[in-house]
Each structure stands twice: as C-alpha cells, then as structure tokens.
C-alpha cells in the first residue's frame, strides 16, 4: 500500500491493518509519489502481489486537491490500483458534483471510490464504488458491514433528495457559489 503522508487517520488506520508492506510519500508531492511507486514496483516484482495507491480527492485539513490527474498518469506507467477517499469532494467538486475525479476528468481510472454523506449532504453514512467483484467481497467480508444496521429510511429518503439537488441546476448554482466564498 502506498499512501500520502498526510492521509486521513482512518486511511492510515486501515493501511496499518494490512499485512503487506506500507510506504508513504511526502504530502501531495508528485516526485516523491513516483519514487515511492518505483520502490513498490521493484518490491512487487521480487515478491509478487500488486500496489494499491491510496489518496484523498480533497484534503480535509487544508482543502488542497490531490493530484489525481498525475496519479492516473503514474497508474498507466506503473500499473497499480487507485483508491480515492473523496469525502470532501463528493457533491462539491466536478461539473455535476461527482467529485474530485470528475473535476480532473479521470473518473474511469479510479478503481475504488469512497464518498461520505457527512459533508456535502449533511447526513450520516457513506459509500464505496468499484468493480462488482470487490464490492461483493467487501459486503460479505467486512465485519463493520456484516454487523451494521442499515441507515434509517428517513436518512435514505433525505439522501436521495440531496442527490437530486446535487444533480440539478440548483446544485450547479450552489457549487459555483461555494467557490466564490
């Protein structure tokens, strides 16, 4: 696992639970990221396995954008998977509010996308989007998912209404207003 040195604590905790090698790169530093990916690639060539790069779309503490467009260039060069935590970008970034990967035009290159309802939707809960095989694995193997209760229907209905707003002309206007503040 390769991740930004200033990734959110939940991402760092998740990475620490992984049994494999973990490597960090300097915060939002393209050259450091590439050097770390090169090291990870050499290690994978020696031992087998693959690389998962974990980053954030918008860093919550600073508001800085992750360099997703450049990370996708590295992905094409070094053949790894990308997980993006876009809790702060979902609903706010991109022409239709689909997040930071939409903002950079790289949505189809993101392998796992994590969004939260707590930020732009002022609610609770979140989601993971990705290939069906991976999502099914998560659904049936994550203890936090297996023993969790579903969201209350009022929150689900409220979330659907908020998604309608995000996708509407009003949502477009609200996103424009957000960036003028």
Regions found by a protein language model. Give the residues of each.
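Conserved PLP-dependent catalytic core of the aminotransferase class-I/II
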Residues: 66, 157-181
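Active-site PLP attachment segment
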Residues: 102-137
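Short, structured coil segments at secondary-structure junctions
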Residues: 17-19, 109
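Active-site phosphate-binding strand-loop segment of PLP-dependent enzymes
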Residues: 23, 27-83
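A short glycine-threonine-serine/GTX helix/turn-capping micro-motif
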Residues: 124-125, 142-151
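Conserved PLP-anchoring active-site segment centered on the Schiff-base-forming lysine
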Residues: 1-9, 179
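Conserved Walker B
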Residues: 6, 58, 86-88
């Amino acid at each position: 696992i390769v991740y930004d040195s200033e990734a959110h604590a939940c991402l760092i905790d998740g990475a620490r639970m992984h049994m494999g090698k973990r490597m960090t790169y300097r915060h939002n530093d393209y050259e450091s990221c590439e050097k770390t990916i090169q090291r990870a690639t050499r290690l994978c060539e020696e031992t087998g396995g693959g690389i998962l790069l974990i980053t954030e779309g918008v860093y919550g503490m600073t508001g800085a954008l992750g360099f997703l467009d450049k990370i996708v260039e590295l992905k094409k060069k070094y053949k790894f998977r990308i997980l993006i935590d876009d809790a702060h970008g979902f609903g706010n970034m991109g022409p239709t509010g689909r997040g930071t990967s939409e903002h950079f035009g790289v949505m189809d290159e993101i392998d796992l996308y994590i969004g939260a309802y707590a930020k732009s939707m002022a609610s609770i809960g979140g989601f993971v989007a990705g290939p069906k095989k991976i999502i099914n694995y998560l659904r049936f193997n994550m203890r936090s998912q297996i023993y969790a209760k579903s969201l209350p229907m009022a929150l689900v209905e409220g979330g659907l209404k908020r998604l309608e707003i995000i996708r509407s002309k009003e949502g477009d206007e609200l996103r424009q207003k957000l960036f003028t503040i």
